[in-house]
C-alpha cells in the first residue's frame, strides 16, 4: 500500500513538473536559450523548455527564420509535430550544418516555404 501511494505521488509530481509549453510567442526565445548552451544538438535538458528534440511544438504556426544563420545547428527535430505550422520561410537559411531527416513532418498546412533551405549547403535528405 505504501508503495502504491509513493508511486502515485511520484506520478502526480512528474505530471505537474512539465516543461514550459512551446508557442508562437516563446519559440524564438526557447531556441535562443537552448542553442546558447547546446548550439549543435539542442540537448538543453536543464532548460525550462527541455531538450529541443522533445519539444511539443504542435500549437506553433510560425517557424519562419527559426534557425536562420545557426551555422552549427544539427539537432534531430524529426519527431516535431509541425502540422499546425503555416510559415517555414527561411527556417534553415544560411544554416551550413543541418542535415536531419524531416520526411515524416506533416507540412500540409504550410503556405510559405520561401527560401526554407536557402544556402543550407549540408542539407541532403
Please name every model-derived segment:
Residues 17-125:
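Negatively charged
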